[in-house]
Structure formats: structure tokens, C-alpha cells
Amino acid sequence: MQTAPLRRPADLSHLSAHEARLACRRGEITGSTAGLAPGHVQANLAVLPKELATDFLLFAQRNPKPCPIIGVSAPGERRIPELGEDLDIATDIPGYRVWRNGEMVEERRDVADLWRDDLVAFAIGCSFSFEAAMVEDGLPLRHVEMGVRVPMYRTNIPCRPAGPFGGPMVVSMRPLKPADAIRAVQITSRFPAVHGAPVHLGLPEAIGIRDLAKPDYGDPVRIGADEIPVFWACGVTPQSVIAASKPAFAITHAPGAMLITDRRNTEFAVI
């Protein structure tokens, strides 16, 4: 199922992070959140019953590249106070996916009516943060130029398992000229809490990707003859893991539709 197309009225383009969340809550923004609240960290989401929370936290600790945890809710709570004022996990993301027994059964605008007292929400760092640093350095982002979602692919790179959780890493791809790819490695290495440096450059078949024109998530992008594909670990990995591990119930964000936080990208830079 594809995420809804971006709907962003012109008067939303300069909203604060809090105002952008409220606009999502009101249904005024759907689809991708790329470019909203510039300078603020956006987060992927995974929500699981509390009996699975410890195992998932251990899974994330063992796999920090695809699953860098930046916030965890208390059981039943729809807020993660350290991530934002008046932040509601169940309503403030423009697209959610509902999973039952490893199957994605529904995509919806909010999950307030599905929330339970035993659910724990995990906010996971998102590559939109390091994309902002790449743009500031003058590096091109093809998916932004084309107005589409970044392409994402399941790979043959195994995640380290924990309890019932395991499965393949998902990566996002950005085509760059070789010199720009080297610079991208330098820039994104500063942001380990939001996936950090790439996990692979070139040769997509070496990590199990057969056709770059057919991403598993997101949208395909043009790749120039003088460019190479550069792959970063991706926060959609929990969705691949949920499909493989088949928990009875889970909620995630829809790919490209993120939780906009009050935290600044600069807070997550290490140098």
C-alpha cells in the first residue's frame, strides 16, 4: 500500500515543529514530512505491547545503525515528553500502519481509537536530520529534487536478533557522484543517532537488491551515469522485522511520514 501523496498548503511551510504536529493532528498534512520544520529532528515510530518492549529495546541496542532509539514512552502513554511539547504519538504523524501477526492490515491517519494501556512507543532517529546537513553543504538529494519519497530496499544484511525480533536490514538510497559520496560519508558520520555513515556504496546486488527501479518502500529516483548509489541504514527496518517476527499487534509510521519533534538536529551531531 502506498503512502498518500504529500498535501502541504503553502501557509504550512514555515510552521514550528509544534505547529506542524498540530497540522498533522488536524489532517492538514498527509504523506511525507520531508522539509517540514527545518532543523528539527524527525522520528520513525514503532509501537508494541509492553511484554515485547524489553526484547525490542535490546534489538535496537544490538542494531544501532538502523534502529537508533531517541525516545521511549511509558506503557499506555501517548507522549514522550523529552521529544516535544503537546506531542501525541497517536495523532501527530500524518500516516500510520497497523500490523497484526506480521501483516500490514491497514494504513490510517491516526490510531487514537486503537491505543491501549499496554502499548509502548519507540521513537527512532530518521535520516531527514542528516539530509538537512547534506543540503547545507550543497549536496544534491534526488528524491527532494523530484518531489518523491526516498527509495528504500530490503537487503540481505541480517540484523542481530533479540528475543522474537530479527530479520533483514532496510536501507535508504541516495545517488551521488563519487566525490559527493565521499563528502556525504564525512557529513553523515557526525550523526550516529540518526543512522550515521552509509552501510554500503555501489553494487546493490552485493546486498541483495536486484533492481533499484523497484524499491520495497518509497519511490524510485533517477540515477545519472556518473553517479553511484549510496545506502544508509533505515528506520523502516522495524517494519521488515515486524513482518518477519509476526507480533500479534504493532503500529508503525507509514514510510516517509514521520513524527516531528522539538529536538534540534544540532543536538545529535557529535562533532
UniProtKB/Swiss-Prot annotation:
Keyword hit for Lyase: yes
InterPro entries reported for this sequence: D-Glu_cyclase, Putative_hydro-lyase, UPF0317
EC number: 4.2.1.-
Top EC class for this record: lyase
Keyword presence, Transmembrane: no
Gene Ontology MF term list: lyase activity
Keywords, in A-Z order: Lyase
Family: Belongs to the D-glutamate cyclase family.
PANTHER family xref list: D-GLUTAMATE CYCLASE, MITOCHONDRIAL
Protein name: Putative hydro-lyase Mnod_1097
Organism whose genome encodes this protein: Methylobacterium nodulans (strain LMG 21967 / CNCM I-2342 / ORS 2060)
